UniProtKB/Swiss-Prot annotation:
Strongly expressed in testis. Keywords: Differentiation, Disease variant, Repeat, Spermatogenesis, TPR repeat. It is linked to Spermatogenic failure 37: An autosomal recessive infertility disorder characterized by asthenoteratozoospermia. Spermatozoa exhibit multiple morphologic abnormalities, primarily consisting of short or absent flagella, and neck defects at the head-tail junction. Belongs to the TTC21 family. This is Tetratricopeptide repeat protein 21A. Gene3D superfamilies: Tetratricopeptide repeat domain.
Length: 1320
């Protein structure tokens, strides 16, 4: 018996209830192969045939089983139902069947009653079905299937209270069994109650016991979608198609996913478009093959596609053709005709739509859908009188049927087209929206939801609203238009549910442009991802950049728009935006050329072979273009031509709404001619009632301030504005004006008044706080923030307060404020989560100063919360995806920066790599990673990242510099120098690069090439020699060529600069403490070149220390590293005094730094120098040996070189020349100009009596010291003498005496001996 197969019967009943009539027949046929001649299966097969309108076949099949006791009752009912659906009704047959039905009822069995109830339920007669099932339950209370069926009947009832009772019957029917139909009903019940987790558990029970039961998998897919889990929905859809390749539900859901979530439907060539089209084709094919004669199902399943495809012509064509075929098969189906009318509206073929709506009216004269469609067509075609006449008739009819959102929208649309009252129109639009959304209450996300949502309808309403909204971005402090808020409310559900629909997204971008300019960009970016050729999106993006003053990006965006869609150039707005940007950027001739060209554009022109119309130049746009031309001509100094164009404009637009705007523009022209009084009189004539009064007063105020320098009249203009147009915006203007003339106290009073008028304006609250800060009333600012936060509960102010406290170094209080802001229950809404992330990031900054161990924990919390936001925004606010990804990336960067500061380089690398999961092409992070690899010594990885950067941006300056550093590390000096040279040729005044080049040429032994670059920089501007960066570079160069006094002179000019000052002071201190650039602590040469005048040398040293100490008072550390640098320099000053107490104090300080910063090269070097001065040589050697093992990095190169030289000196004193030579060669490897290394090598060769080698090294020392140290010249001449090279010895002596005439020692000891040796 079929009743023994729970899955089989559940499937048949499910398909019957879902109206899959061909599926019913197929399932019954499969069952009959297993249970041949089963009357129940035969009945359902006949039922499927009957519902496909093959009535005679169905009657024949039903007659064959009507006498079987189990199905006699339902078969007789089905026969009566079938006869009544015949074209020619056989009354006698019906009478006979009705008599037979009465007879059967008298002796009917419980099973017969069950199937009769089942049939009645399936044909929609719920109350009658209940009667039969209840009667059956009285006869046989143990019949579980009857309880299940009773549950299903209640579940599908249109009465909510009845549906809630369904679970009791279902539970009673299921009991401890795995009844598939009962479990399906139970899952459906939980789904209706929006308890999706419970529903999924029940469905999982079915799939465990009946894995091949497809309806359960379909329900599971629908549940995932109801939970808004698109990933699992799609996965389940594909899993169903693996089992049933033409499953209608799976094809439909995958189509919905492609249209609603993936998008890119507008570019015909795109793969995603083909994917969307293929999904639609698959759905149509599945419907035509699996349910070939089921027009109601065809319409039910395809209608969601027409609601989501927008104006996609390919998909519209497919759907139209399919529905037309459906209509041809069943020409009496009125709903198909109205749907075709709707589709032709989408295709912008209004006349075709009108024909189909008229056809629908013929089929159903009382049908509302056909009539509303006809009215819409009349409105769209401009036949407003006809539309109004029909609408009046429809309103009368509708009174008896209740309110309809479509009818109310049509009323609003008609009023809008007839330019009737704004308030009345927007009230009707609001009512239409409320009715529309009320009909969607309780519908889970799914095909029905999208159908009811009807994005096109909401887009139409939004467009009508926008006609009455402001057309300019909101000014600071200005209240957002309530109409814009309403449009956002309308569009939010659409954008949230279907973020791939471009029309709602673009409208939302428009709303944000007018209300929240900063948030419009990310939405538009999404629009352009979906449709790179969208003219409107490109132009709006350009307007945003123009409003932000980012002209470079504005031009780039215009070019990008043209590259994607050449038709952008046909839009007058394109040329107007371009001209405005050119004007702002100062390219007046090009702006004039552009504007003159756009003026010549025809108002309307249809090109042959094109199906689009050129956008017309509207009067307001034409006025804007002419005024922009006047402005460009004025700024270009063509006042006569500007006056002529302005006069033509005044003549053309006199007496129009544009007249006042033109008057204000004329003021600038009059001012250019120096007629200040005329300009002021023109502005005074504009009265408060006129729309441009505010702009006139602002312009007047600027004239008073900038031209007449009258601050009193400047403020009076804004006070008059507040008097005539009171409100938060004008108060804000007055407050800003007072701030601009440095009267923050008065500004505070005005801001406070504005805030009382608009207490929910976040920008106003922040401005008040900032005004207190500007007035240096920090205590009042803190008190204000605290009070405002308590009164209004505005958590965003916590961040402002936290920032202020951090700025004032009140870190404990800042920590307390931010912690309090974070002490709340777990928040679920995105704005609150975003505010928490902001607080956490600020708290991490606070911890950096006094609780470093808590930084990572806090950043982890911020990233976890940001990850939650990123999971939510694609579903709820997809336009925020780019900005939120940017924030997540910035958190990863903060991790990396923290690890970098702590020298945990591997962790820093991983954190930078994590950025790429959010921003795959972030060049800044790529650069940071390359620099980090260089720091770690991973040269190949560094080169790889630099190469990627230079591929994407050939002239990337920093990448070129880094590549140069890398080439240097690889000992490819020429390649490195060439890279620096290329950068400096393009930007000779890039002093940061020049500084790096000086260091590189020094290390390459080519310092003589540097002066040419100084001359190149001077050619850029006469002001270059005054630039701090230039003087800093000159100072460093002089220091390297042994001119300490010149070096100090140039560095002094950079000492006060914010960029170069700290480095300049650092080097000045080093020069003061060691003007001759000796090896600090080195004693190997002490006896050789001792100065005769010890007291004079001591005095000079003391003067140097004193100057260094004065300089250090100007050294203001801005970071932990610069604080450490200051402590080290202070310690070196103490060390330089050579007084034991000072040296011991310095040693203690160095020990503390070395303990706090393990492996710090400067700290270990200073420690070693202190030990040497205190004659603790073994301890010094131990620290220096540690440094000898440290890998060379450019940032620590100077200190490493000093440490190697000092250790070599110690080895030389101990005659360990081999160890010394190894260190000295390392110095020369990394710095070919290290003359001290050559000097020590010469010293070693001399000690070993290898005078020729000694000469070679001293010669290099003499060359690279730039002849600044006579002692080296003396040693070179001495070794020439020892090597019997008397002529060379004499030459060197003469050189030394020429440059150092006060060095007579060389004359007596070498020159005279060499001369004597030359005499015969």
């Amino acid at each position: 018996m079929s009743s023994n197969d729970s899955s089989l019967m559940a499937g048949i009943i499910y398909y019957s209830q879902e109206k899959y009539f061909h599926h019913v027949q197929q399932a019954a046929a499969v069952g009959l192969e297993k249970f041949s001649n089963d009357p129940v299966l035969k009945f359902f097969k006949a039922y499927g045939v009957l519902k496909e309108e093959h009535i005679q076949d169905a009657i024949s099949d039903l007659e064959s089983i009507r006498h079987h006791p189990d199905v006699s009752l339902c078969s007789t009912m089905a026969l009566i139902y079938a006869h009544k659906r015949c074209e020619i009704i056989d009354r006698e047959a019906i009478q006979e069947l009705e008599y037979s039905l009465k007879e059967i009822r008298k002796t009917v069995s419980g099973t017969a009653l069950y199937y009769a109830g089942l049939f009645l339920w399936l044909i929609g007669r719920h109350d009658k079905a209940k009667e039969y099932i209840d009667r059956m339950l009285k006869i046989s209370r143990g019949f579980r299937e009857a309880y299940v069926l009773r549950g299903w009947v209640d579940l599908t009832s249109d009465k909510p209270h009845t549906a809630k009772k369904a679970i009791e019957y279902l539970e009673q029917g299921i009991q401890d069994t795995k009844d598939v139909l009962g479990l399906m009903g139970k899952a459906m019940y939980f789904m209706m109650q929006q308890n999706y987790s419970e529903a999924l558990e029940v469905v999982n029970q079915i799939t465990v016991t009946s894995g091949s039961f497809l309806p359960a998998l379909v329900l599971k897919m629908q549940l995932f979608l109801a939970r808004q889990d698109w990933e699992q929905t799609v996965e389940m859809g594909h899993r169903i198609l693996e089992k049933d390749e033409s499953n209608i539900d799976a094809c439909q859901i995958l189509t919905v996913h492609e249209l609603a979530r993936e998008g890119n439907m507008t570019t015909v060539s795109s793969l995603k478009t083909q994917k969307a089209t293929n999904h639609v084709r698959n759905l149509i094919k599945a419907l035509e093959t699996r349910e070939p004669e089921n027009p109601s199902l065809h319409l039910k399943k395809i209608i969601v596609v027409s609601r989501l495809c927008g104006s996609h012509q390919v998909i519209l064509g497919l759907v139209c053709s399919f529905i037309e075929r459906t209509f041809m098969a069943t020409p009496s189906y009125v709903h198909v005709a109205t749907e075709l009318g709707y589709l032709f509206i989408l295709k912008n073929q209004v006349k075709e739509a009108l024909l189909w709506y008229s056809e629908a009216m013929k089929l159903d004269k009382d049908g509302m859908a056909g009539l509303t469609g006809i009215i819409l067509c009349h409105i769209l075609e401009g036949h407003l009188e006809e539309a109004e006449y029909r609408l009046e008739f429809l309103k009368e009819v509708q009174k008896s049927l209740g309110k309809s959102e479509v009818l109310i929208f049509l009323q609003a649309l008609l009023m809008s087209r007839k330019h009737k009252g704004e308030e009345e129109t927007t009230a009707l639009l609001k009512e239409a929206v409320e009715l529309h959304f009320s009909s969607m209450q309780g519908i889970p996300l799914g095909s029905e939801y999208f159908e009811k949502l009807d994005p096109y309808f909401l887009v139409c309403i939004a467009k009508e609203y926008l006609l009455f909204c402001p057309k300019q971005p909101r000014l600071p402090g200005q209240i957002v238009s309530p109409l814009l808020k309403q449009v956002a409310v309308i569009l939010n559900p659409v954008v949230k549910a279907a973020p791939a629909l471009i029309d709602p997204l673009y409208l939302m971008a428009q709303v944000r442009y007018y209300s929240e300019l900063e948030n419009a960009q990310s939405i538009l970016q999404r629009c352009l991802e979906l449709d790179p050729a969208s003219v409107d999106a490109h132009l709006l993006m350009c307007q945003i950049y123009l409003a932000q003053g980012n002209f470079g990006m504005c031009f780039h965006c215009l070019e990008l728009g043209v590259s994607h869609n050449f038709q952008v150039r046909d839009h007058p707005l394109y040329h107007l935006i371009k001209a405005r940007a050119l004007n702002k950027a100062g390219d007046y001739p090009e702006a004039i050329k552009t504007l003159k060209m756009v003026i010549k554009l025809p108002a309307l022109k249809k090109e042959e072979g094109r199906k689009f119309l050129r956008p017309s130049v509207q009067p307001s746009q034409r006025a804007s273009i002419l005024l922009e031309l006047v402005e460009a001509l004025r700024l270009n100094g063509e006042l006569h031509e500007a006056t002529k164009v302005m006069q033509d404009t005044i003549n053309e637009f006199g007496g129009t709404p544009e007249e006042n705007r033109i008057t204000i523009a004329n003021v600038d022209l009059v001012l250019s001619k120096g007629n200040v009084d005329v300009a002021l009189n023109m502005l005074r004539n504009i009265l408060p009632k006129q729309s441009c009064y505010m702009e006139a007063r602002e312009k007047m105020a600027n004239i008073y301030l900038q031209t007449l320098r009258d601050r009193r009249l400047y403020i009076r203009c804004y006070r008059e504005l507040c008097e005539h147009l009171p409100g938060p915006h004008t108060s804000l203007l007055l407050g800003d004006a007072l701030m601009s003339i440095l009267e923050p106290e008065k500004a505070l009073e005005v801001y406070d008044e504005a805030y009382r008028q608009n207490p929910h304006d976040a920008s106003l609250a922040s401005r008040i706080g900032h005004a207190y800060v500007k007035a240096h009333q920090y205590t009042e600012a803190i008190e204000y923030y605290e009070a405002a936060q308590k009164i209004n509960g505005q958590d965003f102010l916590c961040c402002d307060l936290g920032k202020l406290l951090l700025k004032l170094k009140k870190v404990n209080k800042a920590e307390k404020v931010l912690k309090q802001a974070l002490e709340h229950d777990i928040v679920q809404d995105i704005p609150s989560m975003m505010n928490d992330v902001k607080c956490l990031l600020l708290l991490a900054k606070v911890y950096k100063s006094h609780k470093k161990e808590a930084v990572i924990e806090t950043l982890n919390k911020a990233l976890d919360l940001q990850s939650r936001i990123l999971k939510r925004v694609p579903l709820e606010q997809p336009e925020m995806i780019p900005s939120q990804k940017q924030l997540a990336a910035s958190i990863c960067i903060q991790f990396a920066e923290h690890y970098l500061a702590e020298k945990e380089y591997d962790k820093a690398v991983q954190s930078y790599k994590d950025v790429f999961s959010y921003l795959p092409t972030d060049n800044k992070v790529m650069l940071e990673l390359a620099q980090l690899y260089l720091l770690q010594g991973h040269l190949d990885l560094c080169e790889q990242h630099c190469a990627i950067l230079l591929q994407t941006e050939q002239n990337h300056e920093t990448a070129s510099v880094l590549m140069a550093d890398l080439m240097f590390r690889k000992q490819k000096h020429e390649a490195a120098i060439n890279l620096y040279h290329q950068v400096l040729e393009k930007a000779p005044d890039n002093f940061l690069v020049l500084h790096k080049l000086i260091d590189l040429l020094r290390r390459s032994g080519k310092l003589e090439d540097i002066p040419a670059f100084f001359e190149l920089a001077k050619k850029v501007s006469s002001r270059v020699p005054l630039e701090p960066g230039f003087n800093y570079c000159r100072g460093i160069y002089c220091w390297h060529i042994g001119q300490p006094n010149e070096a100090l002179k140039f560095l002094n000019k950079a000492r006060k600069d914010s960029t170069w000052g700290q480095s300049a002071i650092y080097h000045m201190v080093q020069i003061c403490l060691n003007p001759d650039n000796e090896v600090v602590g080195g004693e190997a040469f002490e006896n050789q070149g001792a100065e005769s005048n010890y007291m004079e040398k001591k005095e000079l040293e003391q003067q140097g220390v004193s100057t260094a100490e004065k300089l250090l008072r100007e050294f203001y550390p801005h970071s932990d590293s610069s604080q450490t640098q200051l402590r080290l320099l202070q310690g070196l000053c103490r060390l330089a005094t050579r007084e034991k107490a000072n040296m011991e104090a310095a040693l203690g300080s160095f020990i503390q730094i070395a303990q706090a910063e393990k492996d710090s090269v400067p700290a270990l070097l200073a420690l070693a120098q202190a030990y040497v001065f205190l004659k603790q040589i073994p301890k010094a050697r131990m620290q220096l040996k540690r440094l000898a093992k440290t890998p060379w990095v450019l940032s620590e190169a100077e200190d490493l070189e000093k440490s190697w030289l000092l250790l070599a000196d110690i080895y030389c004193q101990g005659s360990k020349f081999d160890l010394a030579l190894e260190l000295l060669r390392r110095c020369v490897q990394y710095n070919k100009s290290c003359y001290k290394a050559y000097e020590y090598m010469g010293f070693i060769m001399e000690k070993e009596q290898s005078y020729k080698d000694a000469v070679t090294n001293y010669k290099l020392a003499w060359k690279y010291s730039h002849h600044a140290n006579p002692a080296i010249g003396f040693k070179l001449a001495f070794n020439y003498l020892k090597d019997k090279k008397f002529v060379e010895a004499i030459e060197i002596c003469n050189d030394v005496l020429r440059e150092h005439p006060d060095y007579p020692k060389i004359r007596e000891e070498i020159l005279e001996k060499a001369r004597r040796s030359l005499r015969p």
